[in-house]
Swiss-Prot record:
This is Protein ApaG. Transmembrane segments: none annotated. The gene is apaG. It comes from the Bacteria. NCBIfam families: PRK05461.1 (NF003967). InterPro entries: ApaG_domain, ApaG_sf, Uncharacterised_ApaG. Residues 2-126 form the ApaG domain. Coiled coil: none annotated. It comes from Vibrio campbellii (strain ATCC BAA-1116). It holds the Pfam family DUF525. SUPFAM superfamilies: ApaG-like.
Length: 126
């Protein structure tokens, strides 16, 4: 499996979901919206994902599975795919990172890394 970074660009936006959170019970819920941009001219298919989620206490959780939000989307050349999902932490600050495994038009698998991104309630410095 090859790592081919330049052809895929990942953009992430996060938001704290206060109405689903309960700080007294150490439950902090975050939503994230991810846009996967295919910068190549060929169609790719996202077949699986792997996340490493770390809270500010150092507690880690790994999430792996097929596709994203129940789909294994095809992303045409110069097109993009956007989806939203969420996670809950026991602390008000955390970090997510991971990778997607994709297929090119020839059926070759490749990995696209997802750089670490911060999950934090507003106005937290940690």
């Amino acid at each position: 499996m090859d790592v081919i970074q330049p052809c895929i660009k990942i953009q992430v936006h996060t938001k704290y979901i206060e109405e689903q959170s309960n700080p007294e019970l150490q439950r902090y819920v975050f939503a994230y919206v991810i846009t996967i941009k295919n910068l190549s001219q060929q169609t790719v298919q996202l077949i699986s994902r792997r996340w490493l989620i770390t809270d500010s206490n150092g507690k880690q959780m790994t999430v792996e599975g097929e596709g994203v939000v129940g789909q294994q989307p095809f992303i045409s050349g110069s097109d993009e795919y956007t989806y939203s999902s969420g996670t809950a932490l026991e602390t008000p600050v955390g970090v997510m990172q991971g990778h997607y495994i994709l297929l090119d038009e020839k059926g070759n698998e490749f990995i696209t890394e997802i750089d670490p991104f911060r999950l934090a309630i507003p106005n937290v410095l940690n």
